């Protein structure tokens, strides 16, 4: 879709830096990516809880939850997956512009799509977190029973089974969820954010 020259951008009266100053912290997106069952949502919510306890303005966008509303019109074909991530990238940008920390938990299987979202943000506002977990461990966990359905042919285009997952080449963080507890993984991320002066 091309840009319509008749639609004009209206500048905000209050800047992002003003909102960050009011909140007492910087804003950024923590983009959790990994296979289904790797622990993205659980880890994102654990980080969110720790941020909340520190008085940080934060919010989690979860891949499943978003498909109940904003993206309920999208399926799992390649084009729909791309649009799913594009929309979330734009929503995440709005949150960051509002001065908040936004945590997104989406499989987001394609590098090109994740790079597309990264390009929306200046350096230091987008952090890719690879929640790494072997496929066989994710299948053993199978919290939603989706791997079993995919193996039985009941679900098509399922990431890791009949649709690829492209692991990040240079993520900002790697949390190996089969070797690191959720609490320890969340602490690693919180400590890194503090060391970088984000919070």
Swiss-Prot record:
Known role: Catalyzes the synthesis of activated sulfate.
Keywords: ATP-binding, Kinase, Nucleotide-binding, Phosphoprotein, Transferase
Protein name per its UniProtKB record: Probable adenylyl-sulfate kinase
Catalytic activity: adenosine 5'-phosphosulfate + ATP = 3'-phosphoadenylyl sulfate + ADP + H(+)
Any one Gene Ontology BP term: sulfate assimilation
Domain of life: Bacteria
GO molecular function: adenylylsulfate kinase activity; ATP binding
EC number: 2.7.1.25
Keyword RNA-binding: no
InterPro entries reported in the protein's UniProt record: APS_kinase, P-loop_NTPase
Species of the source: Bacillus subtilis (strain 168)
Keyword set includes Cell wall biogenesis/degradation: no
The protein's annotated pathway: Sulfur metabolism; hydrogen sulfide biosynthesis; sulfite from sulfate: step 2/3
Active-site residue list: 108 (phosphoserine intermediate)
Binding site for ATP: 34-41
Gene this protein is translated from: yisZ
Homology family: Belongs to the APS kinase family.
Top class in the EC scheme: transferase
């Amino acid at each position: 879709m091309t840009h319509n020259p008749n639609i004009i951008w209206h500048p905000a009266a209050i800047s992002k830096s003003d909102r960050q100053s009011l909140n007492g912290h910087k804003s950024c997106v923590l983009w959790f990516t990994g296979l289904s069952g790797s622990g993205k949502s659980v880890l994102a919510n654990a980080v969110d809880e720790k941020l909340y306890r520190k008085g940080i303005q934060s919010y989690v966008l979860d891949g499943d939850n978003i498909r109940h509303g904003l993206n309920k019109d999208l399926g799992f074909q390649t084009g729909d997956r791309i649009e799913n991530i594009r929309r979330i990238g734009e929503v995440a940008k709005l949150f960051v512009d509002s001065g908040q920390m936004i945590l997104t938990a989406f499989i987001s299987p394609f590098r090109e799509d994740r790079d597309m979202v990264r390009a929306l943000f200046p350096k230091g506002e987008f952090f890719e977190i690879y929640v790494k977990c072997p496929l066989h461990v994710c299948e053993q966990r199978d919290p939603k029973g989706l791997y079993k359905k995919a193996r039985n042919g009941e679900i098509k285009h399922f990431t890791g089974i009949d649709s690829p997952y492209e692991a990040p080449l240079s993520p900002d963080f790697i949390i190996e969820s089969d070797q690191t507890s959720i609490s320890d993984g969340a602490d690693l991320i919180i400590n890194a954010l503090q060391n970088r002066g984000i919070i």
